[in-house]
């Protein structure tokens, strides 16, 4: 499973839209979309926030 697939899976388990996750991370919805398609990777600070949000 790729990082993007994992982000998408965790987001969907929370029943969140990409927009909701983006707001929680202070990024654009497009950034979340790129991550989920593995076209971009979150920066370290965003990875740490993702870990906190989904733990």
Language model: regions and residue ranges:
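Short basic helix-loop element that most often maps to the first helix and adjoining turn
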Residues: 5-24
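DNA major-groove recognition helix of helix-turn-helix/homeodomain DNA-binding modules
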Residues: 45-55
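Alpha-helical and His/Cys-centered functional microenvironments
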Residues: 12, 22, 33-34, 45
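A detector for short, charged/polar N-terminal pre-domain segments
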Residues: 1-2
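Helix-turn-helix DNA-binding elements, focusing on the entry/boundary residues of the two helices
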Residues: 7, 18, 29, 44-47
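Recognition helix of helix-turn-helix/homeodomain-like DNA-binding domains
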Residues: 25-41
